[in-house]
Amino acid sequence: MPNSSSNVIDGRAIANQIHSETAKRVEYLKSKGVIPGLVFIRVGEDPASVVYVGMKEKMSAQLGISSKTFVLPEKTPQSELLELINRLNNDPSVHGILVQAPLPDHISQEVVYSSVSPRKDVDGFHPLNVGKLLLGDKSGFKPCTPAGIQELLIRSGVNTEGADVVILGRGEIVGKPMAAILCQKAKGANSTVTICHSRTRNIEDHCRRADILIAAMGVPKFVKAHMVKPGAVVVDVGVNRVPDPTAKSGSRIVGDVDFENVQPIAGKITPNPGGVGPMTIAMLMQNTVRAAELATGIAL
């Protein structure tokens, strides 16, 4: 049984490795007169979105990526947002466009994601990039969180080949693309994948046979110790705000995994925060630099 924090995967440390690699690519592009450009679009003042965009802006600056944020009022018409995206699609100084979710109810997320040029879709949500992912076509952009989880597993020495992977959650951002990535005939994949969701029967039984358990349901501390096979790798993707009278804000963020009780049983486990989150940003930066390389034909 693991003790202390010896089995905890340090997502921040691995993300920093990737940032170092990305920074070298940025330096090379700049030496050739190309500055990678990333634009964030935020509609409304969702508190979490403000924080997330701020973190991405900060990392862009640290890596030498030029970033700009457009903040639109909550009641902005969809047509106005699409006009902005079209302008950015045609701006050669912009290599990546990220529309921060969630969007207001009157704006169709599907329409917005489809309007971003696939060549600038650094989030990996355009239908063309989703299709490429399913086909195993590596020319597209992978969604940042699933791609970050795969990289986390690879760099942590987790063998995914032939592994029974259980993914909790069937969402478009994590669950479905994660399954597609791990099914590929590729490094860090070749897994046998099961997706569980709210209608899954005997979900605990599925969890208990997982060699790798990826929790992305959005249910606080859903994964309990009795649901985890001893020695399994547990990845916690959940971001859930729960009341906490002891916190200044009156709430705190917890994951989908009961970390304190699962950690002693797991072979490896990601903390939350400090696990998947930093990897998501690392992959966004990597996608942006790759978009700049593809747009200019310049690469290290």
Language-model features, listed with the residues they occupy:
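Positively charged, low-complexity intrinsically disordered leader regions
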Residues: P2-V34
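Glycine-rich phosphate/diphosphate-binding loops that line cofactor/substrate pockets in enzymes
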Residues: E27-I35, R87-P92, G157-T160
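N-terminal glycine-rich anion-binding loops that anchor highly charged ligand groups
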Residues: Y28-L38, E45-Q62
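Glycine-rich phosphate/diphosphate-binding loop of Rossmann-like nucleotide-binding domains
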Residues: V43-E57, D137-V233, V237, V242, ...
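Active-site cofactor/substrate anionic-group-binding motifs, chiefly glycine-
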Residues: S49-S93
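N-terminal small/polar loop signature for handling phosphorylated ligands or for N-terminal nucleophile
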Residues: E74-G96, H106, C196-F222
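Anion-binding alpha/beta catalytic cores of soluble intermediary-metabolism enzymes, centered on
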Residues: G96-V165, H206
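Rossmann-fold NAD(P)-binding glycine/threonine-rich loop
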Residues: Q109-G131, V237-A299
